[in-house]
From Swiss-Prot:
Belongs to the universal ribosomal protein uS7 family. The gene is rps7-A. This is Small ribosomal subunit protein uS7cz/uS7cy. GO terms for cellular component: chloroplast; small ribosomal subunit. Keywords: Chloroplast, Plastid, Ribonucleoprotein, Ribosomal protein, RNA-binding, rRNA-binding. It is found in: Plastid, Chloroplast. One of its GO terms (molecular function) is structural constituent of ribosome.
């Protein structure tokens, strides 16, 4: 490969969803997709947003943002081997990585939740997350507790 004429990277255009025109909604949408069924993912997300609007009488986009903000972790723990022992070392994470984890935890908690369909389960989980309840919030608190307990190993980066 020639080093003189290296190709310049083009900035990827951020994709937005057609209704809310929001990147965060698109991030959630892409993680709902299973087996390439994007139209089903759109239907699930938009119906969940409509249910949030009906239940809370607030802007569903604000509820989604607040839920993700509440669930976003600041620290995670990673396993590191040092002299034959494995330590759980706490790491600070970048905001984008935190959002991705928060979305993943919210969707996982929604899927495990009892309910008639995914739309209602997702809407209830998002509403609970804004109130500071739910399995996704519990997961974040669990991760933060583990990071706090292993703070002594923070030097083993």
């Amino acid at each position: 490969m020639s080093r003189r004429n290296t190709a310049k990277k083009t900035k990827r255009a951020d994709k937005f969803d057609p209704i809310y025109q929001n990147r965060l909604v698109n991030m959630v949408l892409n993680r709902i997709i299973k087996h390439g069924k994007k139209s089903l993912a759109y239907r699930i997300l938009y119906r969940a947003m409509k249910q949030i609007q009906q239940k809370t009488e607030k802007n569903p986009l604000l509820v989604l943002r607040k839920a993700i903000k509440e669930v976003t972790p600041r620290l995670i723990v990673k396993s590191r081997r040092k002299s034959g022992s494995t330590y759980q070392v706490p790491f600070e994470i970048k905001p984008n990585r935190g959002k991705i984890l928060a979305i993943r935890w919210l969707l996982k908690a929604s899927r495990k939740r009892l309910g008639p369909n995914m739309e209602s389960k997702l809407s209830y989980e998002l509403i609970d997350a804004t109130k500071g309840k739910g399995k996704a919030i519990r997961k974040k608190e669990e991760i933060h507790k583990m990071a706090e307990a292993n703070r002594a190993f923070a030097d083993y980066l």
